[in-house]
Amino acid sequence: MTETKRFDVAATFGVQARPGLEVLGFADATHPQIPVPRPYCFRNVLLRDVLAYLHDAGGDGLFLTGPTGSGKTSLVTQIAARLNWPVQSVTCHGRMELNALVGQFVLVQGETRFVHGPLAVAARDGHLLILNESDLMDPAELAGLNDILEGQPLVIPENGGEVIRPHPRFRVFATGNSMGAGDGSGLYPGILRQNLAFMDRFRVIHVDYPDPDVEKAVVLQAVPRLPELIVDKMIVVAGEVRRLFVGAGSEGGPELTLTMSTRTLVRWASLSLAFKGAPRVFEYALRQALTARAEPEQREAIHRIAADVFGDYWEPRP
């Protein structure tokens, strides 16, 4: 994939933009690592920040921080989908080592062969590397990315000293629920404080939950047959659950230990339509979408919020 193509920003992303404003992507739309384009409502400021980084990384990575399910990863993948930009996506965890990103020897048809990892492939071929939940990974391992983030060659001693010089279109994204400084809220078990030198190599943008109007458009794109009145009520419920999750206005901190992400909201809407006609359909769908994994007291609290918002729609009277 070497041939590039210019894309009109307004037409490609469905946003208002200066006439003639273009962004560079790839001409080949057949690469298997290009994400599948899905209905998506781009937020102008976030789109601008990601496109600016894609245009000129300046020796940086881009760290996207925000609450769970706010759309950090989908923002990047849906931009990539529209620019025909292949993506190497990895979900990090506490036991992941740098070798899993660079590559390692594996047994292939009875022979030991070196297989390049997502970092090596992305750097070599000009793909996007997305490190999902990067703040779950051991900071000592992530620090091994410092040099390549600055444009230095990736040297692989295990493969005979192979040297991979980063492709000019190679970009590194990392997502996390923290800003690299650990989790002071206690809501995200497993998050680790990251190495300061590693974080210093990233630009940082905050991806919060969409505004109600944007979120309404997202839900209606995904579930167009659901009445707008019901979607509006679902969004009000989601907003209240999130407020209690982050502890807004509460001196005692968070009152809920789970939240309603945009993807959970879409799931609730989809299930409500799928179970249309069932008794107490919105409660039934909400339980499957979110509250079945909540503590009983928190489940009751969320259902009470929903009942107050939905009124007679929650439990229709005979």
Q: Where in this protein do the model-derived segments appear?
A:
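C-terminal regulatory/interaction module of P-loop NTP-utilizing enzymes
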Residues: 1-318
